[in-house]
């Protein structure tokens, strides 16, 4: 069987604009981009927007913005054009009609006039007889109700085995006789997924189809369409493992917030960290290395080391990877990336806080929690007498020091040494007095980021608020 030149790698993703951008879309896009860039190939974005009821233009925009944020830019697509456009399925309806007409004319497809009630009755009968359901081919026989005006178009499954190569799972084989004649054109004239997708893949010369494992069962039907039309098959497929929630269930848009790609941007995850994590979610590099630049991923990635089973999402691992990326940013870049998350602070204040924040942030949004005391006035804590005394002692040593982290640190450490209580017991009431929280940046920065008079005022207020 003819196949395209394997040296001309062309891959694609084909998301549907029916809701927010899903984490799985980003994962699939990443693996496609890595494969394309490693082979000097082309990455195509196609929009599968034939679901008339659920598609929204704004969701298509969300797909673009999310992929751009991750740096997963495409070479051809609806907004860029290309030699095999249009790249929206809703703009390719004539293409599908022509191909369906051809299959009908060649006897490889037929009109089905069965109503939904009649099809439901067939399914119930199959259930009662405890056999897998497949369409009865009633409309191929003399009893077909051809006087009806509403019909679908079904593909006439030829039978036999459908074989293909999966770069993750190896040689695959399906018995097409178990599939049954499937609908390729719905009663409203729109194509089904298993018809439009292979027609587009063939027309766009897609060499490798890389997608989630939920599409594995679709592959035999799609290859039968390709064969019936006489087109070249893709060189190979790769069906990636599903991303699972921590409890092992499938990641759901309704139940699992981590499935929403926009969440990561809003929470302050760095796009390069998200890509790094997604690459490791189902792929093992075979070494102890866990932090990869994009170029390193391009060179290291291979489908041979992708696991077959689902990959469980792990917030702790993502937070660790994101923290590693944050720590590698220089002061200027970290300041710039923090600014959208700290709109109440000026650039100079953020820059002063950066050295204290760098090692404490699992995500950029966490900076707002740590620095909230800078734009709020937390109530004075109710301290035990001994703790209030420690705050009073701090006021005494801080009154005369230059208001810089190093000087504050030296004076407070002298207080620690004098009291013999240790840093934690000495600093906790000071921290509570200034921020209202038990967690903040290092105490020297916590104080220095406030104007001196404000910091001392809060300390005095707390020292007088004894339980």
Where are these regions (language model features)?
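N-terminal Rossmann-like or analogous alpha/beta NTP/dinucleotide-binding catalytic cores
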Residues: 2-127, 218-232
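Short amphipathic alpha-helical segments and their helix-coil junctions
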Residues: 6-12, 256, 295-302, 336-340, ...
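C-terminal accessory/binding modules appended to enzymatic or scaffolding proteins
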Residues: 385-434
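Glycine- and acidic
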Residues: 11-17, 45-49, 204-209, 259, ...
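Active-site cores that bind ATP or allylic diphosphates and position pyrophosphate for catalysis
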Residues: 110-239, 244-251, 260, 264, ...
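Residue-level signal for inorganic ion chemistry
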Residues: 32, 63, 103, 107, ...
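Catalytic adenosine-cofactor/nucleotide-binding cores of aminoacyl-tRNA synthetases and other
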Residues: 52, 229-232, 236-381, 435-467
């Amino acid at each position: 069987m003819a196949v395209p030149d394997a040296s001309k790698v062309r891959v694609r993703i084909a998301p549907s604009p029916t809701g927010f951008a899903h984490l799985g879309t980003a994962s699939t896009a990443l693996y496609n981009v890595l494969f394309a860039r490693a082979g000097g190939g082309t990455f195509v974005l196609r929009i599968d927007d034939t679901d008339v009821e659920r598609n929204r233009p704004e969701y298509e925009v969300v797909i673009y913005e999310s992929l751009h944020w991750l740096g997963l830019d495409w070479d051809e697509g609806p907004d860029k054009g290309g030699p095999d456009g249009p790249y929206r399925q809703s703009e390719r309806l004539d293409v599908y009609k022509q191909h369906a007409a051809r299959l009908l004319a060649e006897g490889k497809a037929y009109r089905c006039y069965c109503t939904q009630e009649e099809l439901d009755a067939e399914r119930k009968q199959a259930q009662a007889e405890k056999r897998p359901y497949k369409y009865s081919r009633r409309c191929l026989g003399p009893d077909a109700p051809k006087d009806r005006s509403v019909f679908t178009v079904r593909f006439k499954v030829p039978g036999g085995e459908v074989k293909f190569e999966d770069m993750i799972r190896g040689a695959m084989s399906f018995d097409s006789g178990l599939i049954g004649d499937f609908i390729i054109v719905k009663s409203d004239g729109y194509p089904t997924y298993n018809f439009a997708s292979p027609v587009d893949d063939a027309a766009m010369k897609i060499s490798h189809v890389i997608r989630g494992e939920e599409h594995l069962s679709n592959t035999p039907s799609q290859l039968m369409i390709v064969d019936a039309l006489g087109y070249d098959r893709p060189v190979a497929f790769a069906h990636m493992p599903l991303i699972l929630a921590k409890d092992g269930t499938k990641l759901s848009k309704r139940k699992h917030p981590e499935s929403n790609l926009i969440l990561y941007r809003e929470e302050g995850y760095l796009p390069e960290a998200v890509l790094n994590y997604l690459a490791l979610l189902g792929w093992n590099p075979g070494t102890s290395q866990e932090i990869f630049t994009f170029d390193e991923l391009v060179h290291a990635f291979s489908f041979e080391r992708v696991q077959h089973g689902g990959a469980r999402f792990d917030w702790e691992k993502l937070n660790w990877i994101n923290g590693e990326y944050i720590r590698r940013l220089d002061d200027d870049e970290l300041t710039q990336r923090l600014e959208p998350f700290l709109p109440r602070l000026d650039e100079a204040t953020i820059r002063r806080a950066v050295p204290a924040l760098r090692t404490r942030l699992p995500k950029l949004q966490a900076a707002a929690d740590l620095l909230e005391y800078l734009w709020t006035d937390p109530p004075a804590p109710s301290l035990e007498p001994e703790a209030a005394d420690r705050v009073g002692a701090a006021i005494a040593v801080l009154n005369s020091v230059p208001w810089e982290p190093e000087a504050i640190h030296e004076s407070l450490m002298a207080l620690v040494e004098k009291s013999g209580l240790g840093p934690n017991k000495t600093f906790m009431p000071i921290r509570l007095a200034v921020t209202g929280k038990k967690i903040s940046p290092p105490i020297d920065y916590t104080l220095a980021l406030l104007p001196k008079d404000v910091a001392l005022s809060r300390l005095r207020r707390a020292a007088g608020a004894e339980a």
